[in-house]
Amino acid sequence: MRYLLFIALLTTCSILQAQSLRPKSIYASYFGETVTHPGLKIGVTYQLKFWDKTKTRKNGDKRIIQRSIELSPGIGYQTGLFVLPEWSYSRKNAKGNFLTAGIGAGYMRTFIPNVYDLNANGEIESIDAGYNYFLTNYSITFGKDLSVKKMIPISIYIKPQLMYALPNATNGISYFALELGASYKLTKN
């Protein structure tokens, strides 16, 4: 546990110390594999590239499309802790609705509660048990940016994702997870 927290601290500190990258937003969300495995996910979003395009339709309405490529390192808790940076591509329309596709790779440490073993003296003692995994995820995010119409610097989103953990079983194991959250914007884009 100490090592995982130390690695998470080093990763976060190295990203935050980068002079060219400023955090775009911070987020917190419900994160769960199913209703029976609820968890919490928190993180920061960094925008690596941004561009927008305005199109005028035949009826005279303007359509603004904003695109960005983002990096979102996050720390989450489900049946363990994970550090999972994500690369994502996002499109947002003039009404504030957005669609984001993302992929990520990181580390997950699971914990198994109430595990006991015999020590050298033959006494029963509680031990820390769990596994280390390489974790990948693939996600699509559907959301609404409330700052477009209501001037509130918050976005709300739903993010279904497929996660794949190695080593587990013979060929790894897949998880379907759902994330429901809110993001507070620190910048104007």
Short names for language-model regions:
Residues 3, 72, 104-106:
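Histidine- and/or cysteine-centered catalytic micro-motif in compact active-site loops
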Residues 3-12:
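Sec-dependent N-terminal signal peptides
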Residues 4-5, 29, 60, 127, ...:
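Generic structural signal for short, flexible, solvent-exposed coil/loop and linker residues
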Residues 8, 18, 32-34, 59, ...:
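Generic marker of residues within folded, mature protein domains
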Residues 11, 19-21, 151:
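A generic structural signal for short, non-catalytic loop/turn and secondary-structure boundary residues
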Residues 18-80, 185-189:
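Short glycine/proline- and aromatic-enriched beta-strand/turn motifs that initiate or cap beta-hairpins
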Residues 80-189:
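Outer-membrane beta-barrel transmembrane domain signature
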